[in-house]
Amino acid sequence: LLEILMECKKAGNPDMVYKFSSTSKISFPGSGIAAMAASDANLKDIRNMMKVQTIGHDKVNQLRHVRFFKDIHGIVEHMKKHADILRPKFETVLEVLDKELGGLEIGSWIAPRGGYFISFDALDGCAKAIVAKAKEAGVVLTGAGATFPYGKDPHDSNIRIAPTYPPLGDLIVATELFALCVKLSSVEKLLKGME
């Protein structure tokens, strides 16, 4: 993966990109520490703006993070613990999707290499129906199109699956139900197209 700041600099556009990061999902939600990377000129501008926007950063929280993580190696080790907890959940969802939907050509997904979500693309015009059917059956999903600005997916096809919270047993049942909702919504769309 190319490092975008260096690539922009090489291309003569060093001020084009701002990169943001947060420990919010690493340490504890709502109290994470944010970080930003940008060109020297952009960082100078940001510092000038922050002088008048922020009276003082939460230094106690910053200290708490430094004491807990110590350095980048501490963060890496902590993230490995997260991976050990989350990996089986992601593997389970992907296995059920492969088993129930693989080869049917009514949806596609990518096995993520990190992160907290699986991006699922249904047939165009089906995402909202899938999410609604799942909710009616007792499985609450992230809103259809949540990955798009203002939640407006022009194809009504994208669903963000978040397997991090439910226990593994519940996750299997929920994913099977999700797959059933994908099948039902897809059949409804395809039959409607035949009219």
Language-model features: where?
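Short, conserved active-site loop motifs that form the nucleotide-linked donor/cofactor pocket
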Residues: V17, G107, V139
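Short, solvent-exposed loop/turn elements at beta->coil junctions and helix N-caps
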Residues: S21-S24, I106-G107, G145-Y150
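Short beta-strand segments
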Residues: S21, A35-A37, I110-A111, F117-D121, ...
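Conserved glycine-rich beta-strand-loop-beta hairpin in the small C-terminal domain of fold type I
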Residues: K80-L94, I106-D121
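Conserved C-terminal alpha-helix-loop-beta "cap" of PLP-dependent enzymes
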Residues: N42-L43, R47, F117-R160, L168, ...
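PLP-dependent enzyme catalytic core of the Aspartate aminotransferase-like
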Residues: N13, E136, G151-E195
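Conserved core segment of the aminotransferase class I/II
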Residues: M6-R87, L190
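Conserved PLP phosphate-binding loop immediately N-terminal to the Schiff-base lysine helix
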Residues: L1-I4
